[in-house]
């Protein structure tokens, strides 16, 4: 039984973000659909060949997506919301883009579908919409076309499909309430059709992803797997694929299914390999997810070998990435600026493919010398002076309960803040960033490349900040921001100014659609050598009599949106960041900044996938935020911002943050998120987002007023703020001005209606 390698998926965007550039060029009308499709073909061919050359035996096909793989599955099934449909009922790539972003080069603009986090990652998917009596049919043959592409290139492949139960689990009911699980019988014929088409093409194995099987699912959902897979059995071999957690709690359900193999995540799960071997049917293949698909660290392959070697010869075995490599950058070899020692600790997607090949060869031969050689740098890291900072460890150990308490409760603070700021009813603000124009990006790039000296760079940034203040005053906003012209990314910027982080040149990963992020890497203990945001916040405040918010990214979000260390707990990392940013809050306050926003959009996404593990995470996550914020005086107003969240199940923790104002993303969900705050009787102030910044569509005054009136039915108007859903970094100035003008007008109308 020869052991094979495979990956669950590969990054789509390209080493130089070629897909992003092609998408945005097409959306802007600067290139043709044919040019976009050609870029996709070139990337797929390149990525298959790269994986093959790195030692992958079975290449994934179907992991490529033009926007998101869940959205691709929706189109595959003909699940297109009525507002996004073509007049003739056809489905094309512009249909896909209208669902994802609200508009495309053809067709009528319409509200984009909701977007939320993919399990507990920093990737976002487009939420499928379901309605009672809905019909499904095969309307989008992208998977079959890509299978034909790969076969024509002579590759040995493994098509990838998102499984039917997980697909339904990830969606939402729109319109008349009903149980969306009842649609399972209606989507299965489409899956049967697709599997039949794959069988016709000679496909032996299909990877069918059911990550919902790692969750604590209701019994009705667990019971749905058996009839679903009974219907799908028999056409090809099915590799039931799970990731992000272990499967042991749901193993009884899994082993009853008529599949031929199981993939398990042995990085993030607690599954015992010996127990899995004992309980799985003897003829099943086990795919062992031994290489972390969600991080950038080189694996200690000697440990991986020891973990799985006992099964060699006892059952069919593949070695794989824990999850899709979508969550990892592509290629470490192009990183030329990393310190040699630090670089030796890392492995990106292609290097992870190489790790799988090394592991396969050792397991097949019993020869481990190559594993020992590969693992030596990561073993040596444990003793590196770059990793440990005694002063940070001492400060962390000295934290007391008082460090996470504000001076007085919210009611007392609110009085002091009202007296200080004298804001009108329905106060208007934005979330932080303004459009990152070509000029701003060029300025930063020239400075980074050394083509611009520090003085000229600072002069340029100051001018953009000044213009942002002028724009906001002209629009009539009440609480201003400096616009974040100096920041490339809300996490990267702070990581660049904190010790304990390193950065890559090309370590891009997809966040959603064409949006890519370049997460910093936490390599050691974290501290703040100097103030980070104070200078620009102070400058912006000097330009206006209106309050300007200081803007910080919170500790949990910096943790979640970075590649973390693997040698300490996430709690330790979060609290180290909190202590560093606590000093930043104190410095902003001393500089005269009276409103400080600490963004925590990732608080919920960091939740463990199993609810039974939530309490411990929320306890330290909330404590980290409070350590960060609690140094502020009563008259300093602390804001926080959260997005893509379902709040109802963590309202206790949201309230425990004790932020004076929370701004949240609500427009895509039509303010339904406020139900959680109403039911909880949330005591502090709230800014429900009144328009979707992920879409270029400009909301009308009437639309915004209607949303605010709906909000006021749930939250007392005197505690409501008026703001967009999120930062405006990815928008252009024309639609930003138009949308904010309408937002301010709506707030003025409501004030006059009092």
Curated annotation (Swiss-Prot):
Entry binding sites for Zn(2+): 641, 643, 665, 726
Catalytic activity: 5-methyltetrahydropteroyltri-L-glutamate + L-homocysteine = tetrahydropteroyltri-L-glutamate + L-methionine
Principal EC category: transferase
CDD domains named among the record's database cross-references: CIMS_C_terminal_like (cd03311), CIMS_N_terminal_like (cd03312)
GO biological process: methionine biosynthetic process; methylation
Record bears the keyword RNA-binding: no
Pfam family, one: Meth_synt_2
Residues the entry annotates as binding 5-methyltetrahydropteroyltri-L-glutamate: 17-20, 117, 515-516, 561, 605
Residues involved in L-homocysteine binding: 431-433, 484, 599
Residues of the active site: 694 (proton donor)
Cofactor-binding details, from the entry: Binds 1 zinc ion per subunit.
InterPro entries named in the record: Cbl-indep_Met_Synth_N, Cobalamin-indep_Met_synthase, Met_Synth_C/arc, UROD/MetE-like_sf
Domain of life of the native organism: Bacteria
Enzyme Commission number, as recorded: 2.1.1.14
UniProt pathway annotation: Amino-acid biosynthesis; L-methionine biosynthesis via de novo pathway; L-methionine from L-homocysteine (MetE route): step 1/1
The keyword Acyltransferase appears for this protein: no
Annotated keywords: Amino-acid biosynthesis, Metal-binding, Methionine biosynthesis, Methyltransferase, Repeat, Transferase, Zinc
Alphabetized GO MF terms: 5-methyltetrahydropteroyltriglutamate-homocysteine S-methyltransferase activity; zinc ion binding
HAMAP family, per database record: Meth_synth
Function in brief: Catalyzes the transfer of a methyl group from 5-methyltetrahydrofolate to homocysteine resulting in methionine formation.
Name under which the protein is recorded: 5-methyltetrahydropteroyltriglutamate--homocysteine methyltransferase
């Amino acid at each position: 039984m020869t052991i094979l390698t495979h990956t669950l998926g590969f990054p789509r965007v390209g080493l130089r973000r070629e897909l992003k550039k092609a998408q945005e060029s097409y959306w802007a009308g600067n290139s043709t659909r044919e040019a976009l499709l050609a870029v996709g073909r070139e990337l797929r061919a390149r990525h298959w060949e790269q994986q093959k050359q790195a030692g992958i035996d079975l290449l994934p096909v179907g992991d490529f997506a033009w926007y998101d793989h869940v959205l691709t599955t929706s189109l595959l099934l003909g699940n297109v919301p009525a507002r996004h449909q073509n007049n003739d009922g056809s489905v094309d790539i512009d249909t896909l883009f209208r669902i994802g972003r609200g508009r495309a080069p053809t067709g009528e603009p319409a509200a984009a579908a909701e977007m939320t986090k993919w399990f507990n990652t920093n990737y976002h998917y487009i939420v499928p919409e379901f309605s009672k009596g809905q019909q499904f049919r095969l309307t989008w043959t992208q998977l079959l076309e890509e299978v034909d592409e790969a076969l024509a290139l002579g590759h040995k492949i493994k098509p990838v499909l998102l499984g039917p139960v997980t697909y339904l689990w990830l969606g939402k009911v729109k319109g008349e309430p009903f149980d969306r699980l009842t649609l399972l019988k209606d989507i299965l014929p489409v899956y049967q059709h697709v599997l039949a088409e794959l069988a016709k093409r000679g496909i032996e194995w299909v990877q069918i992803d059911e990550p919902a099987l790692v969750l604590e699912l209701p019994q009705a959902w667990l019971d749905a797997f058996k009839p679903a897979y009974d219907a799908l059995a028999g056409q090809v071999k099915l590799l039931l694929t799970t990731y992000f957690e272990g499967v042991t709690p749901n193993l009884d359900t899994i082993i009853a299914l008529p599949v031929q193999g199981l993939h398990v995540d042995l990085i993030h799960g607690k599954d015992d390999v010996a127990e899995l071997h004992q309980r799985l049917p003897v003829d099943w293949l086990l795919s062992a997810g031994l290489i972390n698909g969600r991080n950038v660290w080189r694996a200690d392959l000697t440990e991986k070998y020891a973990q799985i070697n006992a099964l060699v010869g006892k059952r069919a075995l593949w070695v794989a990435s824990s999850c899709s490599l979508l969550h990892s950058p592509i290629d470490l070899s192009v990183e030329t600026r990393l310190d040699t020692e630090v670089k030796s600790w890392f492995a990106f997607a292609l290097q992870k493919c190489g790790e799988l090949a090394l592991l396969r060869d050792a397991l097949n031969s019993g020869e481990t010398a190559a594993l020992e050689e590969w693992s030596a740098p990561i073993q040596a890291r444990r003793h590196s002076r770059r990793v440990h900072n005694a002063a940070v460890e001492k400060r962390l150990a000295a934290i007391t309960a008082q460090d996470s308490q504000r001076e007085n409760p919210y009611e007392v603070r609110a009085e002091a803040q009202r007296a200080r700021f004298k804001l009108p009813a329905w106060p208007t603000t934005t979330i932080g960033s303004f459009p990152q124009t070509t000029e701003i990006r060029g300025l930063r790039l020239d400075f980074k490349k050394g083509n611009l000296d520090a003085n000229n760079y600072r002069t340029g940034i100051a001018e953009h900040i000044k213009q942002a203040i002028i724009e906001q005053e002209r629009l009539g906003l009440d609480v201003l921001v400096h616009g974040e012209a100096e920041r490339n990314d809300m996490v990267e910027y702070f990581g660049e100014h904190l010790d304990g982080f390193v950065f890559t040149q090309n370590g891009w990963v997809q966040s959603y659609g064409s949006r890519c992020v370049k997460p910093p890497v936490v390599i050691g203990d974290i501290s703040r050598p100097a103030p980070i945001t104070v200078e620009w916040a102070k400058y912006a405040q000097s330009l206006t009599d209106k309050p300007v918010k200081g803007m910080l990214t919170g500790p949990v979000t910096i943790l979640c949106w970075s590649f973390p260390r693997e040698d300490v707990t996430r709690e330790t990392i979060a609290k180290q960041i909190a202590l560093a940013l606590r000093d930043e809050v104190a410095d902003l306050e001393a500089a005269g900044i009276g409103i400080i926003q600490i963004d925590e959009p990732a608080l919920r996404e960091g939740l463990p996938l199993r609810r039974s593990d939530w309490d411990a995470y929320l306890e330290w996550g909330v404590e980290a935020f409070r350590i960060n914020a609690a140094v502020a005086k009563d008259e300093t107003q602390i804001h926080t911002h959260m997005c893509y969240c379902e709040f109802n199940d963590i309202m206790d923790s949201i309230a425990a943050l004790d932020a004076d104002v929370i701004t949240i993303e609500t427009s895509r969900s039509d303010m339904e998120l406020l139900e959680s705050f109403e039911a909880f009787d949330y005591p502090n102030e709230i800014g429900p987002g009144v328009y979707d910044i992920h879409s270029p569509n400009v909301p009308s005054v009437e639309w915004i007023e209607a949303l605010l009136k709906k909000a006021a039915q749930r939250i007392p108007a005197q505690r409501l703020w008026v703001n967009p859903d999120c930062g405006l970094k990815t928008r252009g100035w024309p639609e930003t001005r138009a949308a904010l003008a309408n937002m301010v007008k709506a707030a003025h109308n409501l004030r006059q209606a009092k």
